[in-house]
Amino acid sequence: VMAERPTSTTLSLYLWAAVVAHDGTTTLAPPITLPASTRAHPLTIDATGALAADLLGHVASAPPPLPLWHAAQDSLVTEPLAMHGDGTPPCQLAHPHSSAHVDMNGDCLADLFLVCDAGRGRLSYQVWTARRDAPRTYDLARVGDLPPGTGALSFADMNRDGTIDVVFPACERDRCYIHIAYNEQMPLCAPERRGVWGARNASAERCRDAAQLCAPDDAFVLRDGADLVRIPIDALTSDRRLLLVDDIGASQPVPVRVGDYNLDGYPDL
């Protein structure tokens, strides 16, 4: 549980651990107080792949690099997360932010997509890919800027190519848009791309074998900046009136909800 006082600059964190009795009934143990975080809420991730929830964020009493609240016996302890970059300044999580633990390079391991405070009201992002051979270790893969007025980010496969894309609203002056940043990776290998007896044709373009769907593509391209797909909200609504409210009395922005609402196999908004 994350709790915030109106005048506080930190979040108080409490953990009520579930206790399962021999008869299968579940109760909650007394709360454990965790080290407080900054107002940028921690992100729940599984950093080790052990199906145990960890927290990633800024500890209020620690310097900017992102530490990990890691499960240890009956508590969560803070420890550094191994993040190998290229000298890019560490991400200062925005408040609020919509960072995610999601696979961005197609290796079936969840990576870190962090939404960072770039100063002067601007947002940027950093993508850190997980290492299969080293749990709790991430390599910086992509950095970029988000458009002015960007709202909460959502993640979904918008074009059904098997990769996770980024969807978000952004408003400029009096007009709002839905933005889609497509995640482009190597395609599936087609039968004609194989040589005799099923051997791969050396001259064929790079592709992902259907029998090896978790092969990473570290050359993935996230179409941001000028390559973003921008869809005007008023173009989606046709002659129907859509009331855009920029203040609904909540401190957290409302994200775009992605789902297949008409059951045709394609993502809807």
Where do the PLM segments sit?
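Beta-propeller-forming repeat regions
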Residues: 1-269
